[in-house]
Design a protein with these regions (language model features):
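Conserved catalytic-core motifs of GNAT/GCN5-like acyltransferases
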Residues: 111, 121, 128-146
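A conserved beta-strand-loop-helix scaffold within acyl/acetyltransferase catalytic domains
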Residues: 6-81, 222-227
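C-terminal "cap" of GNAT-fold acetyltransferases
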Residues: 137-169, 235-239
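Conserved acetyl-CoA binding element of GNAT-fold acetyltransferases
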Residues: 70-81, 181-188, 192-195
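A short, well-structured alpha-helix characteristic of acyl/acetyltransferase catalytic modules
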Residues: 11-24, 165-181
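Conserved GNAT acetyl-CoA-binding A-motif
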Residues: 100-113
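Conserved glycine-rich acetyl-CoA-binding loop
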Residues: 80-91, 103
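A conserved acidic, glycine/proline-rich C-terminal tail/linker
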Residues: 197-216
Length: 240
């Protein structure tokens, strides 16, 4: 494939192209973020970026300022199915990190579905995000690829200047925490949802119970094992 360029979207036409990309990833029934709204947010300090092979957009990221100084909310990250395997999701996130740090933003937050192993692998294992906040049925009933289960989410904290994130960004060894415990999740929740919807719902509710209890007890997600999918949890450190 032609070399891929990561950059901010530069026109209303590109923003409209991102609507098509969103539908290709999440399904035609899932409402895409509107180009006009993204344009206004971009002009007010938001980030709308894409991964391009020549003039074709292969992946897309949308983030906007939060109510807290130095904190950004990252709302969308989408990669076309045929472009998966090119690490475009992680490349866009590292682009986002550089963009944020240049503007004095040191914390990025976003929600993701904790039962999707591929998302946990990117958000926690690759990027170094952590979480101690569980949001039950956050978006209500959803359509597209998110249909069929309660829309539970984790609020992920990506502390851009933390030792764990800096190590990942620079290719250095990641600091290890000695005492952790594992919490397994399904390897393929989408496949399970197709073959055994009742088992998929049970897996969702079991994970909800386990994470809500863990967070209430002062534990926090600090790692993820992609080979045998499982979260690593540890007690929150003072001030952390």
């Amino acid at each position: 494939m032609t070399d891929v360029t990561i950059r901010e979207l530069a026109s209303l036409a590109e923003l409209r192209d991102s609507e098509d990309l969103q539908r290709a990833v999440w399904g035609q029934d899932d409402p895409a973020d509107n180009a006009d709204l993204m344009l206004a947010i971009q002009h007010e300090g938001g980030l709308v970026a894409g991964a391009f092979a020549e003039d074709r957009m292969l992946a897309f990221l949308f983030a906007f300022p939060s109510a807290l100084p130095g904190v950004q909310h990252s709302h969308r990250l989408a990669v076309l199915p045929e472009a998966r395997g090119l690490r475009l999701g992680s490349r866009l996130k590292w682009f986002q990190r550089d963009w944020c740090l240049a503007k004095g933003i040191t914390l990025v937050r976003w929600t993701y579905d904790p039962i999707r192993a591929i998302n946990a692998g990117l958000n926690v294992r690759v990027l170094g995000g952590t979480s101690g906040t569980y949001l039950e049925n956050y978006y209500g009933t959803m359509e597209g690829i998110n249909a069929g289960l309660p829309s539970d989410r984790l609020m992920l904290d990506w502390q851009l200047d933390s030792p764990a994130v800096v190590a990942r960004a620079t290719g250095r060894p990641v600091p290890r925490i000695a005492e952790t415990r594992r919490l397994p999740i399904p390897a393929d929740i989408d496949g399970l949802l197709l073959t055994d919807p009742a088992a998929a719902l049970t897996a969702r509710m079991d994970l909800r119970r386990d994470l809500v209890e863990a967070f209430a007890a002062g534990e926090r997600i600090i790692g993820f094992d992609s080979t045998a999918p499982a979260y690593h949890l540890a007690k929150s450190q003072p001030g952390g």
